[in-house]
Amino acid sequence: MSVSAFNRRWAAVILEALTRHGVRHVCIAPGSRSTPLTLAAAENPAFIHHTHFDERGLGHLALGLAKVSQQPVAVIVTSGTAVANLYPALIEAGLTGEKLILLTADRPPELIDCGANQAIRQAGMFASHPSQTLSLPRPTQDIPARWLVSTIDNALAMLHAGALHINCPFAEPLYGDMNDTGLVWQQRLGDWWQDEKPWLREARRLASDKQRDWFFWRQKRGVVVAGRMSAEEGKKVAQWAQTLGWPLIGDVLSQTGQPLPCADLWLGNAKAVTELQQAQIVVQLGSSLTGKRLLQWQATCEPEEYWVIDNIEGRLDPAHHRGRRLVAKIADWLELHPAEKRKPWCVGIPRLAELAWQRVVAQRDTFGEAQLAHRIRDYLPEQGQLFVGNSLVVRLIDALSQLPAGYPVYSNRGASGIDGLLSTAAGVQRASAKSTLAIVGDLSALYDLNALALLRQVSAPFVLIVVNNNGGQIFSLLPTPQSKRERFYLMPQNVHFDHAAAMFNLRYHRPENWEELESALAGAWRTPATTVIELVVNDTDGAQTLQQLLAQVSHL
């Protein structure tokens, strides 16, 4: 019997089973113990293969692919700390709902806890963060192939959102020519190999029913809060709120067009808060809200009912309102709960939003971080997409810009870490093949610098704007101790990114005014290549401009 040959047949069943559940993208890191999985993926024509040498970046690449494709994405890594590097992407997927299938190769049981090289306790290592976990046995013909395929099918059928961790131990030898070992075992699955359906089909219904009293609540004074959702859902939510006559507070990731722009500014005005207190119901569609003032208002508002609608399970309301947690796709929920045409009840806030917007526009000519956030809609590629980093940049865009309705916007706003942002953006671009604008801060870029390797080959223009404010300037917005701020919070690195771009053979520009930026962008959108644009800005101007605008708008 050939151990290596049967390892490959065992792995081939696993990978083929994944194709029956919509898996098309497979992300692979180099490794020896994962050889059976890697070869099975490489030999399966149903897959699009992606490779990366860094497992942490690989996990985030898969995350980006899943965000756009809305299908599960598989990841293959070898044993040991390679597995641990998937943790950040796994956590993010659990909070934002993307489906990741993590296939982690492992040593066989007799090599665990005995000093064997590259052998750690992988089973259950991710604690409660995966939505599903599956620890497979060592490949053996004593276990029928139908057990293996039905076990994979069951785990995937139960995966509503988040990650499925499948731990796969393989014994040596891992290499060798294929022979007939296990062929009969494999053939017992019959014509399943030529079929396109799962071996085991399970129906799992997870969607909230129609709220029978909706006809009553839609006649009340309501507020719509729009969080993270798809571009198509964003347009539908905007129309739905407009028909109801309810004010829509749109997050930067809502893709609703933010009909009341600068919400994070005008929510700091007491007049706005007073008017919103008249709301009898708040309907929040989507989670992961960004704006600080929005979160403060959400925490203190007390409507009669607070509904949260999202396709992700679990509680998504940190303020713990009395109301309803409805698990459903937003588009499906809107269809079950049609709007009734009514006049707007909230008349003061639209004027406040207009005045706040005018204050922002008045400062747009200065070359700076806050002004870039405001102008970002002018720089979006036609029929393209936007990826927004975390920390200060996403808050500035949320507060100061107004993105077009239905324009695709992506970000990692689940755990909101700055790790893996470039890798995620690379996955977003690969899944869509659209022109992509990504914007991150300098520390975020440094954190994921080797992901520039993923951007060397792109299928459409990719522009990475690195806003270099020399450190974590978001801490300038917080009451951090002044004497300790620079060393222990901001951590300025005093670096530029021209050499990094050159190392990976990427185009690079460092504009010093808006005209130079616009010229660099115009050239970048004409070429299917990656262009790094570094905006070196005053360290504190972005945070200070936001604080000044907040003060101005609070007194309108």
Swiss-Prot record:
Pathway: Quinol/quinone metabolism; 1,4-dihydroxy-2-naphthoate biosynthesis; 1,4-dihydroxy-2-naphthoate from chorismate: step 2/7; Quinol/quinone metabolism; menaquinone biosynthesis. Gene3D superfamilies: 3.40.50.970, TPP-binding domain (3.40.50.1220). It catalyses: isochorismate + 2-oxoglutarate + H(+) = 5-enolpyruvoyl-6-hydroxy-2-succinyl-cyclohex-3-ene-1-carboxylate + CO2. Binds 1 thiamine pyrophosphate per subunit. InterPro entries: MenaQ_synth_MenD, MenD_middle, THDP-binding, Thiamin_PyroP_enz_TPP-bd_dom, TPP_enzyme_TPP-bd. Its cofactor is Mg(2+); Mn(2+); thiamine diphosphate. Its EC number is 2.2.1.9. It comes from the Bacteria. It holds the Pfam family TPP_enzyme_C. Keywords: Magnesium, Manganese, Menaquinone biosynthesis, Metal-binding, Thiamine pyrophosphate, Transferase. GO terms for biological process: menaquinone biosynthetic process. One of its GO terms (molecular function) is magnesium ion binding. NCBIfam families: menD (TIGR00173). Homodimer. Catalyzes the thiamine diphosphate-dependent decarboxylation of 2-oxoglutarate and the subsequent addition of the resulting succinic semialdehyde-thiamine pyrophosphate anion to isochorismate to yield 2-succinyl-5-enolpyruvyl-6-hydroxy-3-cyclohexene-1-carboxylate (SEPHCHC). HAMAP family: MenD (MF_01659). Belongs to the TPP enzyme family. MenD subfamily. This is 2-succinyl-5-enolpyruvyl-6-hydroxy-3-cyclohexene-1-carboxylate synthase. The gene is menD.
